[in-house]
A protein has these predicted regions:
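Residue-level detector of alpha-helical secondary structure
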Residues: 30, 34-37, 67, 71, ...
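Short, solvent-exposed segments of well-ordered alpha helices
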Residues: 16, 20-27, 72, 76, ...
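Amphipathic alpha-helical binding modules
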Residues: 101-150
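Repeat-associated, polar segments at repeat-unit boundaries in modular proteins
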Residues: 54-75, 126-146
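Amphipathic, heptad-repeat alpha-helical segments
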Residues: 75-96
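Short runs of predominantly hydrophobic/aromatic residues within well-ordered alpha helices
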Residues: 22, 26, 78, 82-85, ...
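Extended amphipathic alpha-helical elements
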Residues: 3-5
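Short terminal alpha-helical segments
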Residues: 7-68, 82-89, 147
Length: 150
């Protein structure tokens, strides 16, 4: 990974963490990520559709950066989180039963936040915000106390 590529990913990570990335783009990116992890043979079509969708909008710059972040694969955090999350949900069966599924999201949110704590033991805010955004993306409202112990 070149310096420029690393810089592009770092910028994307900062945008996720500071919520400066347009949320509808984040939603679409999560869909694209699932496609990437589950159906890599269909990824090219999804990627093209994603870029075309934002080609005439102010969001195009963000869209291109997100694609780069996904394709390059960061040397650590974001790819690890997505892979862990997706593997967990596959084991869980991605149940149709909403309550069952909701339980999976809660447990896995805790697991990810625990796994990626800072060295001093404090919560990693980037991971926390990413998990919460993923849960919001899935359309579930939850009390933060039931998901994460501060």
């Amino acid at each position: 990974m070149t310096k420029r590529e690393k810089g592009g990913f770092a910028m994307t990570a900062i945008q996720f963490a500071t919520n400066s990335l347009p949320f509808h783009l984040f939603q679409d990116y999560m869909n694209l990520t699932v496609t990437f992890l589950k159906y890599s043979n269909n990824y090219e079509n999804q990627k093209d559709n994603f870029l075309i969708q934002y080609a005439r909008e102010d969001d195009n710059y963000y869209a291109v950066q997100l694609i780069k972040a996904l394709e390059i694969g960061p040397s650590g955090l974001l790819k690890s989180i997505f892979t862990d999350y997706w593997n967990y949900m596959c084991q869980f069966g991605i149940a149709e039963n909403t309550e069952h599924y909701f339980g999976g999201l809660c447990m896995n949110g805790n697991e990810l936040i625990e796994k990626y704590r800072n060295q001093d033991g404090s919560r990693n805010e980037f991971v926390y915000k990413l998990v919460m955004a993923y849960v919001e993306w899935k359309g579930y409202e939850m009390n933060q106390k039931s998901v994460v112990a501060a």
